Amino acid sequence: MAKRRPSGDGMVRKRDDGRWEGRIVVGHKENGDSIFHYVSAKTQKALMEKLHRCIVEYDGAELTEDCRMTLGEWLDIWLRECAEPSVRPSTYAGYCGYAERSIKPFLGSKQISKVTAADVQTLYRKLQREGGVDGGALSPATVRRIHGVLHQALNVAVDRHLIVKNPTDDVTLPKKVTAAKTILNDKQLERFMEAIKTDEHWHDFFYLEITTGLRRGELCGLMWTDFDAEKGTLTVRRTLHNKEGGGYYVGETKTGAGRRIIKLPPSTVQLLSERKRTSISQWIFPNPIHPEDPIMPNSGYTRMKKLLAEAGLPDMRFHDLRHTFATHALTSGVDAKTLSGILGHTKTSFTLDTYTHVTGDMHRKASGIVGEFMSDFVVKG
């Protein structure tokens, strides 16, 4: 049997066309045969420089035969074997969409071991300028999400000896741009509350949202078993998702901290208690036509848009109702740690970072109070 050649071992030769060619061992097949990486150059000196860089790059590499598969083939495997079993269906659908529309059309046919950081960087620039196969430039946030998917997939490729290094480690990501939040001020919030009074079907839904700041899926997924009228609490145990192609599925809360018990304001306890007396469904907010099913998250979003327009209020995302609740809670004196628990944030620091526009105002107000106190103290002294 031929001796197994170690990785990094190589050879140099001059080809018939006059160019110099070199190769190094970068792995082995199942039968023990070597897997080579080839480089070529016009001169022997140039070749040796290239070869030296390759030896450094592939130092300690032990690639398998699968290193010859394309990036597209690997993405299919990673999505099926790694992503699908470990993430929520909605997240998995998003991953598949990014792969099919933004990665595979441009880099999918390239051998995975030959995908470079330059290839990935070019892809990201193209997506920002022109978009994927659907057309339309993609936002920095979307490109960063696509990067997250590709980065995860290629990390596993490194672990499985398909590539030596993750090429996405060496790319520059578009600058993160935080989307502007639309917060209803006191007068606007009053108008919104007046608007929902005219909608018997949706009033309770939006009242609960404004007084708890629940995520849309959490709100739609509430059941009567989650409500304790005596204690005045609401337990958030699940979240509802729209299923692609129609229907819904019930999943876990977004994070571990998302599973929480919220102390409700007395007015909200009274509202839910009265609602429960006439309810015929296990869901707090059932589908009006099929009460055995919950109301769909998209329905709440659509109705909110109409209510805002009818009330002459600024257009906003459903999530901005959550921001509105949080902003008014902070300005009313609720401390950040308590608010973090109500919102289901994993860390209080995230709450503080998210609502810096509020905490900044609170700090300025506090400094003014301290300043007045110190001025009085100095004068009295």
What are these regions (language model features)?
Residues G136-P140, R144-I146, D159-K165, D169-M223, ...:
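Basic, Lys/Arg- and aromatic-enriched nucleic-acid-binding interface segment
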Residues D169-D170, K231-V236, R317, H328, ...:
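Short functional hotspots where side chains directly engage DNA or cofactors
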Residues K42, K175, I183, L240-N242, ...:
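Catalytic-site neighborhood detector that most strongly recognizes the C-terminal catalytic loop/helix
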Residues M1-K3, E194, K231, E244-Q270, ...:
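C-terminal secondary-structure termini that scaffold catalytic or DNA-interacting sites
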Residues S7, M11, Y98-S102, S109-T122, ...:
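N-terminal DNA-binding recognition helix of tyrosine site-specific recombinases/integrases
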Residues D159, Y207, T211-E218, S299, ...:
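C-terminal catalytic core of tyrosine-transesterase DNA break-rejoin enzymes
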Residues H28, D186-K187, T239-N242, P265-P314:
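Active-site/catalytic core of tyrosine-dependent DNA strand-transfer enzymes
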Residues R15-T122, R275-I284:
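N-terminal DNA-binding module of tyrosine recombinases/phage integrases
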